[in-house]
Structure formats: structure tokens, C-alpha cells
Amino acid sequence: MSNTNFSTSRSSKSIPELPNLEALRSLWPPPSLNESGDTRSVWTTHTGEPVASSVLSTSGSNNFSSPLKRPAPESHDAPIGRRLMVDDPRLIKHGKYDFSRHCTDYGHSYEWPYFRSLRRESMLYHTSGSYPESQPPYSSYSTDAPHYYHAGSESSAYYDSRSRLHGIQPPPKRRTLSPPPRRLADPVVVGSSRYVEEEVYRRPPYTLASEVPSSASAYQAGYSSYPVRSSPQLSHEDTRHGIASSGSTRYPFVPANTRASHSPSLLEPYAHSLPSSVAPVGAYPEKSSYLLSNSSNDSASRKEKPKARASTPPPLNFSRASEHRNEKGERISMINPRVVLDENGISHRSRYFIMLCDNETAIAHAKKTSIWAVKKDSSKRISDAYKKASVYFIFVAQQTYNALGYAQVVSDLNSTELPFWSDSSHAGGVRIKWIKTCNLFSAEISEIVSHMDHGSEARDGMEMMYDEGSRLCTLINYAIMKRIGRDR
């Protein structure tokens, strides 16, 4: 058996001949007689049988393997996809797998092998029911007595053997800095501070006042002590608040204790803020006199979680911007008084130009390639400004005044070729570095752009005042953070 020679009279090279099958077979030693019949190889045990029949036969899925490789393991010998093996899976098939520790946000839980599919877990551990389990099999603070079984019993293999289950579960890690969640009625522990913790994260809302107000709630957030009464003295109101009805020491149960959150605003929403900022002064007559007396105090109490949304900076009156002067009489910025401006309100360090875009293809191409075409009307001003200061372009949609982002100019004019969407009205291209990209509407951005040119609408490519440009960049940042929910 030799290879066919395809060489013609015009080709000087020919394909070398390959050795025949008999020569290849002689290079490999024949199988020994005591070798098991399960061994599959390219070289068949019967010499008269051609090799192609064993190679091309599709009777079994594991029928062919190279002589240089070990055959693939069978599924019953080594289960594929399970790196973590236990002694005998039959011993733990009745144990419930703790899915509350399986799918929680540990630092490592989203990496293999701790985040496996629920279907594979249910097939392996023979669990039934809903996922995750309604109650974990072992609570963190279990007070049940351990079970003891005699040596011949098989119950210990799947009832309360924690050491056997430790091999197949992620390690029990603390997920937060807050204390662990407690049950509804805490067990009474006399002479121990296990269930009573000092509140180190906050102070009571009346620490700055001279005395505790009479309207302060009896159930403040945390574990405030109260006089112990005997069980016949406990009223129905106390039982409704969750006070344990047995034992000498009792602790009030309030909703803040359920998940150990240190947020008093869940109980007293207006305890740390003046009612004038939330509601009219007369809305809370019993609290308004006390809370308004704190407004004269210089040191306000520490702001508590949950945080309110970050408020937008107060609007600026750009029509009176020229009135802001320093001691020398120089014009200064309304936003940053240390920035000295010229009489046109322009800084010599940072200069801002507005780009009104009416072409969606142009802005999409600019966001991908970071190349922008400058029109002939403003090309000289932008080129001169780039040589002296940092130049920023603020992109705004011409029709809707949506903010499209802002970028810094990082090259001079004509340093790059014009993009494909430019026309004869463009002088050249500049390379830009995007700082923020978005497509958001803000009423204040629209207001500034519509009154930028001395009370009239802005023109494409015009230079704006330092305060206007800095303010627009800040508003774009606020709009983006509010859109993605990061403004808290």
C-alpha cells in the first residue's frame, strides 16, 4: 500500500511514500497472552482481522483509544465531575444537604466546587422537597442534647453525625460583621452576656439633650433593660411585643432584633432628623418642641443607616456669576473659590466646550473609536486652548438635551484622520479620552444648556464658563449614579 504520486512534468518534487501497515504493525510489540480481553487497542488481538474494523466499529462509546493514552475511566469507577469524594455515599444518602450554606455569599461560594447545580446535588444526596430547604438540618445555636447510639446501630450514620457531613459541605463562615440572627424568644441565660451585646455602633437620639424626653419610645433599638416584673404583672401589650414570659431576666423583642440590624430608623423613622425636613412642624406636636431645640446645637448627631439618597447640589445662578470676587477683586469660581477666572468666566487650566450632537451614528462611532471631528467654526479656539490648558468636550443631544457624556481631548487638531461620518463642515479630527458615557435626561442639564449663551440656547462647539462646565460634569455624574442606584 503506497501513496499515489500526483507529480506532473512541471513539478520537480514528489510526495514521499508512506510505510505500509505491516511495517507499522511490526514496530509495536504483540499483546501478551495473559492480558485481559477488556483491553482495547489499535492493534487487534486477531492478526487476520483488518485494523479498520476495530477502529470504525461503533458498538461501544469507549471503543477506541490511542495506544499512547490511558482509556477513559468508566462512570462507576471514577465519577466524572466529582473531585470531592466521601468514604461511602450509601452511608449519607439519608442526610439533608444544607442548602442555606450552599448558595450563600461567602467569598468562595461562587467558585467551583461549592456552587454546583441543584439537580446534581439532589441526585447525589437523594434529597427531596423544595430548594433551598425550608429549615437547615442543624441550627447554629442548637440546644438539643446530642444523640447516642450503640455500636451496632446504623442510625448514627445519617442522623446526627456532623463530622461525616463536614466533608461535603462548605466551611461555616461568618458572612457579615453583625451578630448572628436570633430566634423569636431567646433562651434565658443567667449570669452570662451571650445574648446581650453592647451597642457600639450608635448612640441614643437623646444623648445631646439635657434629659430623656417623655415621648421617647420604651422599646428603643437594641437591648435596653427595663424593670423586671413577675408573670401576672405582664400585660397583654408586653406579650404582644415579644417579651419572654418565663425566667427572672427578660429582654424586649423588637423588629430590629430579628436580623440584628443596628438601624433605629426602622422603629423611630424621625428620631434622628428634624421634622421640618420630613413633614410640617405641627405634624408631630409631642416631638416637635424637643427636636427643634436640637437644631441650635452645633454638633449634630451621627447620621444613621439606611442612608438617604444623595441630594443634588443646589442650583447655581449663573447670571450673577461675575459678582463672585476675591480680596484682590479677581473673578473667582462659584463652585471652587480657589479657581481664579478671567472676566469671561474662563479658567486658564481647564476649559470646556459643548458638542451638540444630532447624529446617533457619530456619537456611537466616537464612543467606540475615541475620535471626534471638530467643525471649522470652533477649530481654532479648540486648538489654541489645547496648547495652554486641559480641554474637555461635553456631549449633549441637540434635540432632547440628553447628556451623552464628557471626555478630555488628548491630541491636537488634525492629528488623526477624520471619521467616516464627517463632511466638508469639519476641519479635522481630535483624539479624546472618555470619562463618562451615558444617555440620560436631567432637567437641570437641559436648563443650563438652554440658557448658556447669555440666556439663549447653546451653539455647537461654543466654549462655556468654567462654572457651567464643571457643573455639567457633576450633574452627569449624579445622573449616572442615580440611574444605576449607587447614589446612596
Curated annotation (Swiss-Prot):
Composition skew (Polar residues), residue ranges: 1-14, 33-47, 54-66
One example of a Gene Ontology biological process annotation: regulation of siRNA-independent facultative heterochromatin formation
Residue ranges with Low complexity bias: 289-299
CDD domains with a match to the protein in the record: YTH
Entries under Pfam families matching the protein: YTH
Gene inactivation effect: Read-through transcription of regulatory lncRNAs (long non-coding RNAs). Decreases premature pre-mRNA 3'-end formation of ssm4. Increases levels and cytoplasmic localization of mating and meiosis specific transcripts during vegetative growth. Decreases heterochromatin formation at meiotic heterochromatin islands.
Domain YTH: 350-476
Keyword Signal: no
Superkingdom as given in the UniProt entry: Eukaryota
Residue list for modification Phosphoserine: S178, S230, S231, S261, S263, S265, S311
Listed result of changing Y97A: Decreases interaction with erh1
Entry-linked InterPro entries: YTH_domain, YTH_prot
Compartments where found: Nucleus
Bias (Basic and acidic residues): 71-80
Protein name, as recorded: RNA binding exosome specificity factor Mmi1
Organism whose genome encodes this protein: Schizosaccharomyces pombe (strain 972 / ATCC 24843) (Fission yeast)
Gene behind this protein: mmi1
